[in-house]
Regions:
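N-terminal strand-loop-strand
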Residues: 67-68, 82, 86, 90-143, ...
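Nudix hydrolase/Nudix homology domain
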Residues: 1-67, 78-80, 135-141, 187, ...
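Generic recognition of flexible, low-complexity loop/linker segments
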Residues: 103-104, 114-115, 180-182, 206, ...
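Active-site-adjacent beta-strand/loop module that shapes the phosphate/pyrophosphate-binding cleft
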Residues: 182-208
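Beta-rich nucleic-acid/ligand-interaction surfaces
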Residues: 86-87, 175-189
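Active-site pocket-lining segments that scaffold enzyme catalytic pockets across diverse folds
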Residues: 71-77
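Short Gly/Pro-enriched turn/cap motifs at secondary-structure boundaries
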Residues: 105-108, 184-185, 210
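The catalytic Nudix box helix
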Residues: 144-179, 194-196
C-alpha cells in the first residue's frame, strides 16, 4: 500500500529477500514457487520498471552477502538506509577519521565497462566478435567488443585500447562516440555504449586477434545482413542472425546469435543499422 512520509514523500515499499544461502529443500514446495534461471528472469520482465527493480534488488542482495565485516578493522558492519550503505559498528574504526576525510561507511561499487560497436565510415560494415567463453550449449554468439575501463582512463581511451587489444583494429581517439549507458548489476557494472568509426585504408581495418587473445573470432559483417535480422526480431534473450554462413565461413549447421533486447549490444547494433539505412 502506498505510504506518505513527511507529507511530501510517497511511494510503495519494495523488499528484496536473498535466498542465496538456502537449498531447495528450504523452499516452500508448491505450485506458486517457480525456480528461475538468469535467462528466464529476463524473458519474464515486462518493462523497464520491472527490470530496474530486479536489477536493484539483485545488486543490493549480492552486495550485502559479499560484505559481513569491516574491510579496515574486521568488526561487524551494519547495513543502513534500506541496505544501500553499510557502516562499521566500531566507533574507533580507523575508517572513521574526519581529519583524513574518511568515514566508516561504504557504498556499493560500480565497475565501468566500455561496449563498442566498430563500424566503417559509411556504416555499411560492422565488426562483431565471438568470445572464447562458452555462452551456452549449442549457442554461437557474436557481439560487440567489451572490456573494463582501467583506472585513470577516459571512456574514449578505454574504448580505443579495448578495440585494438581484442581485434587489432586501429581506431582514432577522435572517432569514438559515446551513445548511451546501461546499468548492469551482474554483479556491479555500468555499461557504456560507444561507436568506434574506422577509416578503411587497407591497414586500419585489418583484424588481428593476437594482441590479447580473448576472442575466438571477429569479422566484418555487412550491416544489411544485420538489418534483415532486426527486421524480423520481436523479443527474447538472444537475437537469431539470418546470415549466409558460407559468406562468413561459418559452420553451415550452426545458428548464429546476437544479444537480445535486454543488452546494450543490441541497442548499439540497432543504432548502426539505423544510421546505415539513413545513408542509402
Amino acid at each position: 500500500k502506498d505510504f506518505i512520509y513527511k507529507e511530501q514523500y510517497s511511494g510503495t515499499p519494495i523488499f528484496a529477500i536473498n535466498f542465496a544461502d538456502k537449498v531447495e529443500t528450504d523452499y516452500i514446495q508448491n505450485d506458486s514457487v517457480t525456480k528461475l534461471t538468469f535467462q528466464s528472469v529476463f524473458n519474464d520482465l515486462t518493462d523497464n520498471m520491472e527490470a530496474s527493480l530486479y536489477s536493484h534488488a539483485r545488486m543490493y542482495t549480492q552486495w550485502s552477502t559479499k560484505f559481513k565485516r569491516c574491510v579496515e578493522c574486521g568488526e561487524e558492519i551494519q547495513f543502513i538506509h534500506g541496505g544501500s550503505k553499510w557502516v562499521c559498528t566500531r566507533s574507533q574504526c580507523p575508517l572513521a577519521d574526519p581529519l583524513q576525510h574518511r568515514n566508516n561507511a561504504a557504498y556499493p561499487r560500480t565497475d565501468p565497462v566500455v561496449i563498442t560497436a566498430i563500424v566503417n565510415r559509411d556504416w555499411s560494415k560492422c565488426c562483431l566478435a565471438r568470445s572464447k567463453r562458452s555462452i551456452g550449449k549449442g549457442i554461437i554468439m557474436y557481439s560487440t567488443v567489451a572490456g573494463f575501463m582501467e583506472p585513470g582512463e577516459t571512456i574514449e581511451s578505454s574504448c580505443q585500447r579495448e578495440v585494438w587489444e581484442e581485434t587489432g583494429i586501429d581506431v582514432k581517439y577522435k572517432d569514438i562516440t559515446i551513445v548511451k549507458s546501461q546499468p548492469w548489476p551482474y554483479p556491479q557494472n555500468l555499461m557504456i555504449g560507444c561507436i568506434a568509426t574506422v577509416d578503411f585504408n587497407g591497414q586500419n581495418e585489418i583484424i588481428d586477434l593476437n594482441h590479447d587473445p580473448e576472442l575466438l573470432d571477429a569479422q566484418w559483417f555487412d550491416t544489411r545482413d544485420l538489418s534483415n535480422s532486426l527486421a524480423t526480431y520481436e523479443s527474447g534473450f538472444l537475437l537469431p542472425l539470418k546470415l549466409d554462413n558460407a559468406k562468413y565461413s561459418l559452420d553451415p549447421e550452426i545458428t548464429v546469435q546476437l544479444p537480445g533486447k535486454n543488452a546494450i549490444a543490441y541497442d548499439l547494433v540497432t543504432y548502426v543499422v539505423k544510421k546505415f539505412e539513413e545513408t542509402v
